[in-house]
């Protein structure tokens, strides 16, 4: 392997890790292994700390391929709690409002999901990395400032109801989504809740695929040190 010339690595991001932490962890162990102080490493699509799943990292000259990977379709499996919302649309914040769910049936959920197929407009979450007047939206939102973000067009290629537990004390649904770059599944949860005349937020999110890369193709960052120590390394000094 030649990390300076460029390698593409696939990881299953652990729960609680930021995307930044994954990149830093991988960079540290590559630099240690090949004996350099710095190396360009970047990822092809962030995942929230509370999400898990496929992350593609590029090293060295392969970082030029990041944009290519960003445009690949992504597949997610998401669990939504119905009847309650949070400011961030996930478990990062406490529930701020509750709504009735007694009118929701499996048939209503399935019919509602079809409305999200194809080209749709989506307003990103205030707690997101979108830029507002040169600052990240989440920086403003965490200060309690009002954040107004414009709707963005995106494409939902597939949406499927995998599980529907409406009789539970905290009703949940589990869905599979195949979507384009720029889709916020947290915002999709918000919009599905509203379309059901209720509320919803994300309680679990797994990115199961990016392009042709699936979870079974991925390394565990927590075992990356052991993995890289077993690899045969090319140290071609002409490829800085």
Swiss-Prot record:
It comes from the Bacteria. It is an enzyme of class 5 (isomerase). Its EC number is 5.4.99.25. Signal peptide: none annotated. CDD domains: PseudoU_synth_EcTruB. InterPro entries: PsdUridine_synth_cat_dom_sf, PsdUridine_synth_N, tRNA_psdUridine_synth_TruB, TruB_C. One of its GO terms (molecular function) is tRNA pseudouridine(55) synthase activity. One of its GO terms (biological process) is mRNA pseudouridine synthesis. The active site is at residue 48. Keywords: Isomerase, tRNA processing. It catalyses: uridine(55) in tRNA = pseudouridine(55) in tRNA. The keyword Transcription does not apply. The keyword Transmembrane helix does not apply. Belongs to the pseudouridine synthase TruB family. Type 1 subfamily. Responsible for synthesis of pseudouridine from uracil-55 in the psi GC loop of transfer RNAs. This is tRNA pseudouridine synthase B. It comes from Bacteroides thetaiotaomicron (strain ATCC 29148 / DSM 2079 / JCM 5827 / CCUG 10774 / NCTC 10582 / VPI-5482 / E50).
């Amino acid at each position: 392997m030649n990390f300076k010339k460029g390698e593409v690595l696939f990881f299953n991001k652990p729960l609680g890790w930021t995307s930044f932490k994954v990149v830093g962890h991988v960079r540290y162990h590559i630099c240690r292994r090949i004996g350099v102080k710095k190396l360009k490493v970047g990822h092809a699509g962030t995942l929230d700390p509370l999400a898990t799943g496929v992350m593609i990292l590029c090293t060295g000259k392969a970082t030029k391929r990041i944009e290519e990977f960003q445009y690949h379709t992504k597949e997610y499996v998401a669990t939504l709690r119905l009847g309650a919302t949070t400011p961030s649309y996930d478990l990062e914040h406490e529930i701020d409002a509750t709504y009735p769910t007694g009118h929701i049936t499996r048939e209503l959920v399935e019919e509602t999901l079809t409305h999200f197929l194809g080209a749709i407009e989506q307003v990103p979450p205030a707690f997101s990395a979108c830029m507002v007047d040169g600052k990240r939206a989440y920086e403003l939102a965490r200060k309690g400032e009002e954040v107004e973000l414009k709707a963005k067009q995106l494409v939902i290629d597939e949406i499927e109801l995998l599980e529907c537990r409406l009789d539970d004390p905290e009703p949940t649904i589990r869905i599979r989504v195949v979507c384009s770059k720029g889709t916020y599944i947290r915002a999709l949860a918000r919009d599905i809740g509203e379309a059901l005349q209720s509320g919803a937020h994300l309680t679990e999110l797994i990115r199961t695929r990016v392009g042709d890369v699936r979870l079974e193709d991925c390394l565990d960052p927590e075992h990356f040190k052991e993995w890289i120590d077993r690899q045969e390394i090319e140290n071609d000094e002409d490829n800085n």
